[in-house]
């Protein structure tokens, strides 16, 4: 985790220096998480979601890049009746989270195994799997 927020979160940027530095500190990390003051906003090139007490928690739109895949996942979750809470998940909530995942156009919906040294209790848990299924179904329906 990096204790900073992207300066202009609504703009897709190629300024990856802070994320590069963060990944150098943890060679096993696939992405760096932006965590200003302990609030998880997004990762270096993906949107971030955490499942806490059965609710999907993700940063409010005004704090992050509102990517296409992020919008799709939020819409699919709400259409399926899943609770989506628009607030920044906290680093302090990681130990009690059930799942976490990142999204992106290429990554689609990718489970998170750990945040820093803290392991996520369920890697590719039921909510992540359900959203992956809903997304695959939406693509299949579109192609028919």
Q: What is each of the regions a protein language model found here?
A:
Residues 1-144:
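Helix-start/capping segments and mature chain N-termini
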């Amino acid at each position: 985790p990096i204790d900073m927020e992207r300066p202009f979160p609504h703009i897709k940027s190629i300024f990856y220096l802070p994320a590069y530095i963060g990944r150098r500190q943890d060679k096993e990390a696939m992405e760096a998480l932006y965590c200003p003051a302990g609030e998880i906003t997004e990762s270096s090139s993906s949107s971030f979601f955490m499942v806490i007490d059965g609710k999907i928690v993700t940063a409010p739109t005004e704090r992050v890049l509102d990517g296409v895949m992020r919008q799709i996942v939020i819409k699919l979750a709400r259409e399926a009746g899943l609770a989506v809470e628009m607030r920044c998940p906290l680093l302090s909530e990681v130990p009690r989270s059930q799942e976490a995942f990142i999204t992106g156009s290429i990554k689609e919906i990718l489970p998170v195994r750990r945040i820093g040294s803290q392991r996520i209790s369920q890697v590719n848990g039921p909510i992540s799997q359900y959203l992956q299924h809903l997304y695959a179904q939406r693509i299949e329906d579109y192609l028919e």
